[in-house]
Amino acid sequence: MYTDPYFSRFVLPEDLKEALQKSRFLCYPETIEQLAEMSYGPAHSSRYDVSYSIAGKGLVKEAEVARCKNGTVVNFMEDYMRRRDPDCMSIGDDLPTDKPRFSDRYGYPFAELRKETMDWLSTQQLILLPFKAGGPYFGYESLMVCPVNAAFFALALANMQGFTSIFDVHDEYKPRAIIYVAPPFRHTHFNGRQAVIHQRCEDLHEVFSYNLYPGPSAKKGVFSMLLDIGEHEGWITNHASAAMLESPYENEVVFMHEGASGGGKSEMLEEIHEEEDGKLLLGVHTVTGEKHYLTLRETCKIHPIADDMVMAHKDMQDDGGFLKIVDAEDGWFLRMDGDTGYGCNAEYERLSIHPSEPLVFFNMDGVPGATCLIWEHIPDSDGTPCTNPRMIIPRRMTDNIIPGNEPQEVEVRSFGVRMPPSTDEHPDYGVMGMVQFVPVSLAWVWRLVSPRGYKNPSIADSNAGSGLKAEGVGSYWPFATGKKVTQANMLLHQMLDCPNTLNILIPNQHIGAYKVGFMGEWLVREYLARHNGTIKMKHLVPARCPIFGYSLDEMKLDGQYIRQTFLRPELQSHLEDGGYDAGAKILTDFFKEQLQQFLTDDLDPLGRQIIELVLRDAPLEDYLALTPMNLK
């Protein structure tokens, strides 16, 4: 039986405790540098193969780890393992869930596979990595159990959630969540597919990761843990980015931007993209080719808060009427597919080429001893660059970042949607104005549906005939393990408790016939930051489509007016009322289809009233009667 001076500090499930006691070797990393060095294998080589002996297949090479000047570069042998499989989640317990259960999917109880997993772990040399799920300041004590030869996986988790040295682990350390990593089971039990099984109980959330791509476990698996813990305790981890904008007039306004994949979360943290002459290309008319430009003498300074996961813990909240948030991560798992050559993203290129500490890269061309360049993506088997190149940037390396231990009040809560081009000849649902102001009731409805929308870069499937597909409650539903209605109720109350937060909708890609990319999002950010995150009712007009709330009657930036055709698309000559109404009907019909599933006995009565308004095409006034807007 294996024992060591640290093992007794942990309070663990009995079967895990037994497996660890049988293990040949347990490693407790003392420093993150030690953990990084372990990624290169026992010989500390410049290139290390992560392989496993699989019955009937022999030695299977899962990944290759290269030691580059600027960090650790990991590449998977299979194209399939270079990105998250959205169907990999199953639930291994009997608690309430709307997700597929393991027993239904595979035909036998998860308890059997759990025992096999523990038996396999007991034969391995293992890393025990304590960490804080939710970040180092407000997170929950957790643990990862991982084979030593997959140390890169532990390194990725430590960079995303923060490294905890074994020296900092106190006696009676009882994890609230545990991640188990057992890569061979992908081949022996799941026919080569990714599988991540969640097992929940009252005081423990366990994630069994049977594959080595960290997306569904070290990244989104932690998101699942936090959503489950929050469900028990009454708070939410939102799928959002957040930033404090400091205007040229020294106003400071905190934005939190939600949305389905491709909804503009990462763009909220980006500087405005300028043309070579410094002008801003507001939009290009898809019919006439006409271009509209704008010039800003000075733009807002961006102070990032969070990139993807925003913790709104109940203990942070007060009665001030604003949602208080912090980053739920200590490092960001950034997708670099848009960086296709030198100069595409100067900030991340600078951070990655000469980092202050070694980084971790995935799906990039890493040559031992050389510098990994974030625009050199590993080729997939067909010769094309991998579409999911990633790097992990610790928060502490990001310029102007808000410290992770300082909760911020959200003054503007935006929701982004990818929109298609829309004209009277070819009407589609891309008829939202550059910014729409909505009451809580409508802001909540948009988050229940979380439409993925037009030409999503991350998602291949689409809803037949419309290009629309719902990502589900809060856009975090793909990572939740419980019931949709439970999350819907929690989200409604989170928003009702923040009457002073301004709720807005922002389209990207197109506004009617104009191709705009993310320029609308950046300009709305600039406009509201200059107005201290507020708007006066006298500047609003009811949108022609009720679920869009109010439109802005005019927008002025640096003395320049934005054309009304961007604010109220029905005024566009190639769209007009007829094309607008046809496009709005596509969207509202989709909402009606998606909202039906929430009409259960467990839905909050106010939530039922709101959904019924959508189903009967109620006017904006009816939504305002249920949830008034706190505007002057």
Regions found by a protein language model. Give the residues of each.
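N-terminal pre-Walker A segment at the start of P-loop NTPase domains
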Residues: 215-248
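Short acidic, glycine/serine/threonine-rich loops at helix termini
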Residues: 139-144, 269-270, 315-319, 338
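Conserved nucleotide-sensing/catalytic segment adjacent to the nucleotide-binding pocket
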Residues: 281, 286-376
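Conserved, well-ordered active-site substructure
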Residues: 254-256, 319-333, 517-529
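Glycine-rich phosphate-binding P-loop
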Residues: 250-280
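Long, basic/Gly/Ser/Thr-rich N-terminal segments
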Residues: 1-215
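Flexible loop/turn segments at secondary-structure boundaries
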Residues: 137, 215, 263-266, 276-278, ...
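Conserved NTP phosphate-binding and transfer environment spanning the P-loop NTPase/kinase superfamily
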Residues: 2-61, 334-632
